[in-house]
Amino acid sequence: MHFSVRLSLFLTLASSLPLVSAVPQHEDQAYTFSSSGRSATTDTDPALDVRQETLRTPSAWTRLRDSLVESVWGLPQRSEGCESRPRNRAKTVSRAPATLQARYGEDVVLRFTIKNQEEVKALVEASNILFLDVWGSHDDWVDIRLSRDVIPSLLGLLPPSLQTSHVPLIRDLAQTIYESYPKAGSAPPSQQGPTTRRFSPSASTSKSKPHEAKNIFFQDYQPLSVLLPWMRLLVSMFSSHTTLISVGTTAEGRDIPALRVGVHPTNNAQQAPRRRTIVISGGTHAREWISVSTVSYIAYSFITGYGKSKSITKLLEQFDYVFIPTVNPDGYAYTFSTDRLWRKNRQQTSLSFCPGIDLDHSWGYEWDGNATRSNPCSESYAGDQPFEAVEAREIASWARNEVTVNNVHFVAFVDLHSYSQQILYPYGHSCAHLPANLENLEELGAGLAKAIRKSSRENYDVKAACRGIVASCTGDKDADEPVTSSALERTAGSALDWFFHDLDVRFSYQIKLRDRGSYGFLLPREHIVPTGKEIYRAMVAMGKFLVSPHVLEEDIDGLRASEEPQDYDNDLEDGEDDKDEQDSTVFRAQADDLQS
C-alpha cells in the first residue's frame, strides 16, 4: 500500500480516537467517572480498577481499529534485545492425585550398599520380618521399598555398617509413579476419570520422519486394551508369517495372547520335520512394564523384517518364534487401573484381602513354597502347591501339548524381567547343580551380552541365576551355595528352571532389562526403544548361534569397537528404507480402517 494512503488512514484513525470513550459499552462493563477521574466507587482498591480495566473485553470499535492498524502496518516485530526474550516461567508439573498420594505418599525406595555375607544375611532377615518389598539387587546393592515410618524399625534390625550405607533412590514414589503412566492418561482411569485410549498410528503428525512412523506404538507404555488390537493388526497385515494364538487362560478368564512368527514350507508331500521353536516372554511380574514393551518391540522387528532383512528372513525360515508380551494379563491390567506396583497375578488365595501368586515361583520343578505358604500377602508367595498359579499351569500345559501333539521342538526360552541388566542361565534354585551344557550356556550368554554392548554400549552381566542376586556378597564367589538359598528374591520354582529341566530346552535364559540407575520398575518411556533395540540385537545373535554356533563370534567380532550403536534400519538392504516407509503408511491406513 502506498505511503500516502497509509498516512491518510492513520490520520483518520487518530482523529477518531477522542470518540472512543463515547462508544457505548456493555452494561456489565460500564464505568462512571467522578470529577477526579477516579471511579465513583472510591472505597475499592485502586489496583482493582486497573485489573478490571485490563480484563475488560475490548469494544467493537477498539477491535476494528486494531485490526485495521495490523492490516496496514502489520504486527510489530520483536527486537532481538533483552526485552524480546521470553520471561522465565516456572515449569508447571501436575501433582499426583489424592488416590496415589494415599497409596504411595509415604513410601520411598532405599538402596543399600552391601559388602559381605553378614550384611546380606542381616538384610534378608530384616526384610522377611518386616515383609518389605525388595525391588531388585545386584552384586553390591539392594533396593527396598518401604514406608518412611518403617525406616527406623528396619535400621534397628541391621548391623551398624548398614545403618549408614543406604541412600534414597526414589524420594517421592507417588509422584514418580504418576509420571510413569502414559501421556494420554497420566494416572489410572480410576484416579483421573474416564478415558478412552486405543491404538492409533495415524495420530502421528505429518511432519514425522519416515523411520519414526514404525515406532509410534513404542513412544509410550501401552495398556492391555491397546496391546491386543495392536497384535491383531499385525496379524492382519502380515498374515503370511504371523499368527495370533492363545497359550492359556488367566485366573480372571482372559486369554494369554501370543504371536507365532515363522515361515513354513509349502510342500506338504512329506511330513514336516519337527519345527524348532524359540519362546520369548515378558510381563511375568505385572509391574515390569519394560519387559512387555521389549517383547512387543522384538516381535514387531521380526515380523516387519521378513523379506527386508536377510538375517531375519533366514531366521524365520529356520525357526518359529512365539512372542508372549505378557504372561500375566490380569496383573498387567491391574497396574494400569489400580496399583502400578502390583507384582503377582490376581488369583484368589486363602486370604481374601491378599490375592495373587508370584508366577515365577509357581512352576513345578524344585518348587519350594514352604517359606511363604503361611503368608499369601508376601510378594513372593508361591502358592500352596506347585502350579497353583493358573497362568503358570496353563502355559506349561500348552508347552507340553506343543511337544507331544504338534511336533514342536523348543530350542530356546527367554524370559524378560526388570531390572539390573543381567543375563541369567540355569539353575536358579541352587548353585549345587550345574547344567550339563554349562559351557554352551556361558558362551551364548556372553555372545548376547556382547551383541547388546555393540548395539548400545550397555553392559549386561552373565551368570547363573542362583548367583544373580548377591553373587559377590558371599565372601567367596566360588562357593557352591551362596546366600541365595534364603535370598532376597527366591528363585525356586521358576519358569527358567522348568523349561530347561522338565521340557529339555537347552538354551534357557532370564534377562533382567534396564536399568541400574535410579528408576527401578518405573523406567521412563524414553528407554522403551533403546531397550527394545539392544535386546532385539541379542535375539538375532541367539538365532544365528542356534543356526551355526561358530557364526556368532565372527558376527560380533566383525563390529569395530569404534562403531556407532547400530540401528535396525542398518540391517536392511539398499532401497528397502523406501519400502519400510511405504509399509508404515499402509500400516497406519489399515489401522484407521480397522478402527472404523
Curated annotation (Swiss-Prot):
Q: Which GO terms describe its biological process?
A: cell wall organization; proteolysis
Write the protein's name. Inactive metallocarboxypeptidase ECM14
Q: Which domain of life is it from?
A: Eukaryota
Signal sequence, renumbered to the chain: 1-22
Propiece residues: 23-184
Family recorded in the similarity comment:
Belongs to the peptidase M14 family.
UniProt lists compositionally biased (Acidic residues) regions at: 564-583
User: Which parts of the sequence are annotated with region: Disordered?
Assistant: 181-210, 557-596
Compositional bias (Polar residues): 188-207
InterPro entries in alphabetical order: Peptidase_M14
Matching entries from SUPFAM superfamilies are given as:
Zn-dependent exopeptidases
Pfam families attached to this UniProt entry: Peptidase_M14
Q: Which residues bind Zn(2+)?
A: H285, E288, H417
- Residues recorded as binding substrate, renumbered to this chain, are H285, A286, R287, E288, R343, D360, H361, S418, Y419
The protein's role, per its UniProt record? Inactive carboxypeptidase that may play a role in cell wall organization and biogenesis.
* Gene3D superfamilies, sorted: Zn peptidases
User: One GO molecular-function annotation for this sequence?
Assistant: zinc ion binding
Q: Which cofactors does this gene product need?
A: Zn(2+)
Q: Which residues are glycosylated?
A: N370
